[in-house]
Amino acid sequence: MSDKKGKVYFIGGGPGDPELLTIKAKNILEIADIVIYADSLVHPSIVDYANPAAEVYGSKKLNLEEMTALELKAASEGKIVARVQSGDPSIYGSILDQMRILKSNDVDFEIIPGVASAFAASALLQTELTVPGVSQSVIFTRLEGRVPMPPREQLKDLASHGCTLLIFLSITRMTKLVGELREAGYPEDTPIAVAYKVGWEEEQVIRGDLTDIAKKVRDAKITLSALVMVGAAFDPNILDMENVDSSNLYSPGYTHLYRSAVANSK
């Protein structure tokens, strides 16, 4: 065992585009002794930033015990471990179990946030997730599958709020997804965008509504790595709509901590 204390970094690798990797994440990759990356989800070019002398492992075939064994062994030898996740580790990143094991073994760890696919997709669609007068709330969720949802978190219940919905890990169950949106009272013309592999070379956006989005997704043969985005914020004509409220933040007639309202302004 080394006298030098090792450390594990949980790194958000972003949605795919290596230019969306944070500077801090890049810096850690360049000094890490061990790199464990989600090779089924993280763009391979992200690993190109790794220290040339680093041991690199793909995690798609590793279970929790195997992964944490690598992390614990490296830490006991005073090494730096970069555990690279896709997007941001805090959103469906499955890192809590690893952190518990590290904590129980007195191993230091740190989370380095990344650009989540939801935000990269919003940028790709050239919209905001929170549009004044349309939706000021965002729900991150998924359909119930093999992993059950907690009570009161079924999609039909969450969708009843009518706010912006970002639905992860559900692309293979679009018919069920649309059915739950209908059950929640969404109109048939509700805008839906499906963002596939945002930031990758094969990036694709499919637009539709409740009447056709399931068929469009099936026809495109998309079964993985896609985010379903639901709500008026994703209307393809959002930039041309006249009935969308303007933000008060920069309105001449709005007073806030750093600026007084201009007299007689609307």
Regions from the PLM with identified roles:
Residues 20-24, 43-44, 68-70, 126-127, ...:
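A generic local structural motif
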Residues 50, 125-129, 181, 185:
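Active-site catalytic pocket residues across diverse enzymes, especially alpha/beta-hydrolases
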